[in-house]
A protein has these predicted regions:
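Residue-level signal for short hydrophobic patches within transmembrane helices
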Residues: 16, 20-39, 43, 66-73, ...
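Transmembrane helical elements of multi-pass membrane transporters/channels
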Residues: 25-44, 146, 180, 209-213, ...
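Generic alpha-helical transmembrane segments of integral inner-membrane proteins
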Residues: 31, 35, 39, 43, ...
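Short runs within selected transmembrane alpha-helices of multi-pass transporters and secretion channels
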Residues: 78, 147-165, 173-181, 202-215, ...
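Short alpha-helical transmembrane segments in multi-pass integral membrane proteins
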Residues: 1-27, 85-150, 194-250, 306-371, ...
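Transmembrane alpha-helix boundary and packing residues in multipass membrane permease domains
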Residues: 30, 34, 46, 83, ...
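Small-residue-rich hydrophobic transmembrane alpha-helices
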Residues: 57-117, 154-173, 280-338, 342-344, ...
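Helix-terminus/linker motif at the lipid-water interface of multi-pass membrane proteins
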Residues: 35, 39-58, 127-134, 190-197, ...
Length: 459
């Protein structure tokens, strides 16, 4: 085993000392970073909704689930790069760390280029399959085609940020997103309002901001003196490391794609209520997204901390990481979910002034935000399992619990009780079902993993 890398001022020691304060130090910048990244889309929606109209708002919002379904397989693979990098870094395996970084970044570039072509040639047909109304489909297709031109930069940023998270650095990605997010907001106001470019202006602003955040993360990787330094001459795919990345990342990506497919089905059900409900769901879903990225940052922390401690052979610390993450996740979800429900109409007014749209959005928030702590718990368990290198079974159980429940609900319950309330109660029902399945899986996987690890001193 090679000497462990000396940590720079941006990195967090995940394997020693108290856990909760380090979790917060890791998760808070990641949470703010994720919120800023979500604001890229939120600014598009707010500016387009306020200055272009409800149809344009519905057009932009109707693309969210579809975009996520297309890109999340590749983003899931970045989780594999994160887990593998964290494990090698904690174990002091510098050569393996370098090979992982260069393989991951090469794959990111290739997948981004592939997604450009997917976006250009598949978006219209996909929107038609979703029964997107005729009055919004042209604008939705235009937005998606422009947005997908940013995919190479989007992928490189996300894979680069995953590598930085693996070594405990969440502060610099936050700084980069503050810069690119501010530019995105200014460009939205400039292109949509001053130049009256509508949804195209919002999409172009997002593309430019993605380019900027990508360049900044690449600069960070190119200039570091650590073992994760990126060098153009070393770019290439090493099958051994890509396979290990895929073993964790592909199941996570497939899970995300399939879950987003269930969200596409849900979007199709919302579409059946008309453009007012679509606009209300767009605004509510954007607020809902802020809850997701907040608790998901804790899941990311759980995965990185678990992976590093697994690499360092500290199984008791792995247990403590999951417990502390659950406590933190419930606190965050209850606080933010309650606030989103309490101030729902005021928050929705940021997106639109249409009273009917606000009423629909408020109703949707009521059914999704108050139980969101269940979603946080549901995601933490497979996050810990992935940190231990187990991803396939959690994927299968998540698909059965989440997607299976939602499909049953959409096609079995919703048709006989057609209302927004019944439709959106599919969320907490699917979260509960998945928690039960994942908890059983965790018990057996933890027992197996711990039996293969050496005895250690008490924490």
């Amino acid at each position: 085993m090679e000497a462990t890398q000396k940590k720079n001022k941006y990195e967090i020691d995940m394997c020693n000392g108290t856990i909760m304060d380090k979790l917060i130090s890791f998760a808070l910048p990641l949470m703010v970073s994720s919120i800023l990244q979500l604001l890229f889309n939120a600014v598009d929606i707010i500016v387009v909704g306020r200055f272009t109209g409800s149809q344009a708002l519905a057009a932009v919002g109707s693309t969210t689930a579809l975009i996520n379904m297309f890109v999340n397989l590749f983003i899931g693979v970045s989780l594999g790069a994160n887990v593998l990098s964290a494990r090698f870094y904690a174990a002091g395996k510098e050569r393996e760390m370098s090979e992982t970084v260069h393989t991951a970044m090469t794959f990111a570039l290739i997948s981004g280029i592939v997604m450009v072509f997917v976006g250009l040639f598949c978006t219209r047909g996909a929107l038609e399959l979703m029964d997107t109304p005729a009055d919004v489909i042209d604008q939705a297709a235009l937005y998606m085609k422009i947005y997908f031109c940013s995919m190479p930069f989007f992928m490189l940023y996300n894979y680069g940020a995953a590598i930085l998270r693996a070594v405990g650095d969440t502060k610099r990605p936050l700084l980069f997103l503050i810069i690119s997010g501010a530019i995105n907001a200014v460009l939205n106001l400039f292109l949509v309002i001053a130049f009256s470019m509508g949804v195209a202006g919002g999409a172009i602003a997002t593309v430019i901001s993605q380019v900027i955040s990508c360049v900044l993360v690449l600069w960070c990787l190119f200039t570091t003196d650590s073992c994760y330094r990126l060098q153009i001459s070393k770019l290439g795919i090493k099958g051994e490391y890509l396979l290990q990345i895929f073993q964790v990342g592909v199941p996570a990506g497939i899970q995300s794609v399939v879950i987003n497919f269930s969200n596409v089905l849900l979007q199709s059900s919302v579409n059946s209520f008309g453009s007012i409900a679509m606009a209300g769901y767009t605004a509510a879903n954007n607020i809902f997204g802020f809850l997701f990225v907040s608790v998901n940052s804790i899941t990311q922390a759980c995965m990185s901390f678990t992976s590093q401690n697994y690499g360092a052979g500290k199984k008791k610390r792995m247990d403590r990481v999951l417990i502390d993450c659950m406590i933190l996740s419930v606190i965050v979800a209850v606080t933010l979910g309650g606030s989103a429900n309490l101030f729902g109409p005021q928050l929705l007014h940021i997106y639109t002034t249409d009273a009917d749209v606000i009423a629909c959005g408020t109703e949707i928030l009521l059914y999704t935000t108050l139980t969101y702590f269940l979603c946080g718990i549901m995601d933490l368990i497979p996050g810990a399992l992935r940190g231990m290198g187990h991803s396939a079974v959690p994927m299968i159980l998540s698909i059965i619990g989440t997607v299976g429940t939602r499909i049953f609900w959409i096609y079995g319950v919703f048709p006989t009780h057609r209302s927004l309330m019944v439709l959106f109660l599919s969320y907490p029902a699917s979260w509960l079902a998945t928690i039960l399945l994942q908890a059983i899986c965790f018990y057996f996987v933890r027992k197996k993993v711990h039996s293969t690890m050496p005895q250690e001193e008490p924490l």
